[in-house]
């Protein structure tokens, strides 16, 4: 396909126009008095949101250069969302401010490479100052506050997220589901749960609840199909002699092996339940390994030289209780070695850090939660489908925001932390003139989030920035009330990770804008004009 090329100032200004259009739609959502944006969908009802990355993803511009500029700023929002789960609007506002200042200086003759270097040095100092300002989350109320802010000031969402995190811990998984009822509900899962139920309903022990409950069972974990009773019989006899029930987790249990377990259960000779192993392929192998570590068993597999017919009780795991329904299995208080469990948790954390796939990261996070924490499900309901989707999205954002706060701590919110950190830009900075100009650009850009919050609240941005600059450190504008307060005491807080990521990603993309000297884009296809109708153009009957 033919290409078109723009150079120097024309190229940069084309990118800037695209950035301005995207940033204009995103930044109106910043702060407690930020507005919503309605997004048209090809199918179904429109979406209403105040989430920066959701808005950015929907924007596609017609002009090829503007489209590229918008795509570059989209990356700021996406990257910030991936790393920290929030701060996408702040990142977009910072990027726009840095690019405006930078292009003005490049047009005036400044060296773009030196400006970029100055930006990088300043950002490094600001991130260090943010770390100094950061405070650990000490109370459940602080978790509720930071989650509420991310959820657009909805305190009910903040409270339920704080409750969920209190129950499942730092590494626990909090999922959000749509509910048919109004309001919010919290459902907690005790122990490790995976989504495979009993193979046969004959294993049920509680007819009323349609579940099988085993107290203090042995647990067999096998990455094989079990169909021959002669393979299983030696182990069954040993378990029967021990007088305990048995949970069998295998690739499949079928044929005479399944029939033997069912017949003995019905006759009351021996209590057991068979379930299929969760997952497929390599993921199944990993999840069986997790179950084995949690319960203190070994995975019976020919790959590691272990055969079922030779298995002893030493290879089986234990748990205080197992509950199996038709859809899932829950293992409560597995008897695995705490040291081995901690090692497995560290291994999964390391895999999460190295993974560059969102899907893989999500699955690893679920495995981590099953081992180290627990699973909490927040069920959200609303009056209409549009409101339900918007509310669910806000809760998901708030959960990630709260987790980021637990991870790296909190700083004063409302743009105050960046304003405070701007004082560190020139600390010990000895650089050439253009690099110093780059650092000054960062110092100015750090006031923009506060300025935009004030503008969205109907106030004069410049006046508010100067007022806050002259207040005691840590004090700022509560845009919801228009009063000046101690931000930490008022519960107006941001996760340090979110603020840091927003600045770093904004600076990165600004550097790319400034050092761009040519843009190559696809030539737009010419639209064919409709042919004039033949004849006199009269009506036809």
UniProtKB/Swiss-Prot annotation:
Catalytic reactions on record: ATP + H2O + a folded polypeptide = ADP + phosphate + an unfolded polypeptide
UniProt keyword annotation of Hydrolase present: no
PROSITE patterns: CHAPERONINS_CPN60
Keyword Cytoplasm attached: yes
Organism domain of life: Bacteria
Example GO biological process: protein refolding
Binding positions (ATP): 29-32, 86-90, 414, 478-480, 494
SUPFAM superfamilies xref list: GroEL apical domain-like, GroEL equatorial domain-like, GroEL-intermediate domain like
EC number: 5.6.1.7
GO terms assigned for molecular function: ATP binding; ATP-dependent protein folding chaperone; isomerase activity; unfolded protein binding
A GO cellular-component term linked to this record: cytoplasm
InterPro entries tied to this protein: Chaperonin_Cpn60_CS, Cpn60/GroEL, Cpn60/GroEL/TCP-1, GroEL-like_apical_dom_sf, GROEL-like_equatorial_sf, TCP-1-like_intermed_sf
PANTHER family for this protein: 60 KDA HEAT SHOCK PROTEIN, MITOCHONDRIAL
Quaternary structure (record): Forms a cylinder of 14 subunits composed of two heptameric rings stacked back-to-back. Interacts with the co-chaperonin GroES.
Function: Together with its co-chaperonin GroES, plays an essential role in assisting protein folding. The GroEL-GroES system forms a nano-cage that allows encapsulation of the non-native substrate proteins and provides a physical environment optimized to promote and accelerate protein folding.
Protein name: Chaperonin GroEL 2
């Amino acid at each position: 396909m033919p290409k078109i090329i723009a150079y120097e100032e024309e190229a940069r200004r084309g990118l800037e126009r695209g950035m301005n259009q995207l940033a204009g739609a995103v930044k109106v959502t910043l702060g407690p008095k930020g507005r919503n944006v309605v997004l048209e969908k090809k199918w179904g009802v429109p979406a209403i949101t105040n989430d920066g990355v959701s808005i950015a993803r929907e924007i596609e511009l017609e002009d090829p250069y503007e489209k590229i500029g918008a795509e570059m700023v989209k990356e700021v929002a996406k990257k910030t969302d991936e790393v920290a789960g929030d701060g996408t609007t702040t990142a977009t506002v910072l990027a726009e401010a840095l690019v405006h200042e930078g292009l003005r200086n490049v047009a005036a003759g400044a060296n773009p490479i030196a400006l970029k270097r100055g930006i990088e040095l300043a950002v490094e100092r600001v991130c260090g100052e943010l770390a100094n300002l950061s405070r650990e989350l000490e109370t459940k109320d602080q978790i509720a506050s930071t989650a509420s802010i991310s959820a657009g000031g909805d305190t009910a969402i903040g409270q339920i997220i704080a409750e969920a995190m209190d129950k499942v811990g730092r590494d626990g998984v909090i999922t959000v589901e749509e509910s048919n009822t109004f309001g919010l509900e919290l459902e907690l899962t005790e122990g490790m749960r995976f989504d495979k139920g009993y193979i046969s309903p004959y294993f049920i022990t509680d007819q009323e609840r349609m579940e099988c409950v085993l107290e203090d069972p042995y647990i067999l974990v096998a990455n094989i199909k079990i169909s021959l009773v002669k393979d299983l019989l030696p182990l069954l006899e040993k378990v029967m002699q021990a007088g305990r029930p048995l949970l069998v987790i295998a690739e499949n249990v079928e044929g005479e092996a399944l029939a033997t377990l069912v017949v003995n259960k019905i006759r009351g000779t021996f209590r057991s339940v068979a379930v299929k192993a969760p997952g497929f392929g390599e993921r199944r192998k990993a999840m069986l390994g997790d179950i084995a570590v949690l319960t203190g068993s070994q995975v019976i597999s020919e790959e590691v030289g272990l055969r079922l017919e030779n298995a002893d009780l030493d290879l089986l795991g234990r748990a205080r209780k197992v509950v199996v329904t038709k859809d899932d299995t829950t293992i409560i208080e597995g008897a695995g070695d705490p040291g081995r469990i901690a090692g497995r948790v560290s291994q999964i954390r390391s895999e999460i850090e190295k993974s560059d796939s969102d899907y893989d990261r999500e699955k690893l996070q679920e495995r981590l939660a099953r081992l180290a924490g627990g699973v909490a499900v927040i069920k959200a309901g609303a009056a209409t489908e549009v409101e339900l989707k918007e509310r669910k999205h806000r809760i998901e954002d708030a959960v990630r925001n709260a987790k980021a706060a637990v991870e790296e701590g909190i700083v004063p919110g409302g743009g105050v932390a960046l304003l405070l950190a701007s004082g560190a830009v020139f600390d010990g900075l000895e650089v050439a003139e253009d690099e110093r100009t780059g650092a000054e650009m960062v110092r100015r850009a750090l006031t923009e989030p506060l300025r935009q919050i004030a503008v969205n609240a109907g106030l004069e941005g410049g006046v508010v920035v100067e007022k806050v600059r002259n207040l005691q450190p840590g004090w700022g504008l509560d845009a919801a009330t228009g009063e000046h307060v101690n931000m930490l005491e008022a519960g107006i807080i941001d996760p340090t990770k979110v603020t840091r990521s927003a600045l770093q990603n904004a600076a990165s993309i600004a550097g790319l804008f400034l050092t761009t000297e040519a843009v190559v884009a696809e030539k737009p296809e010419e639209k064919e004009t409709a042919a004039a109708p033949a004849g006199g153009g009269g009506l036809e009957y």
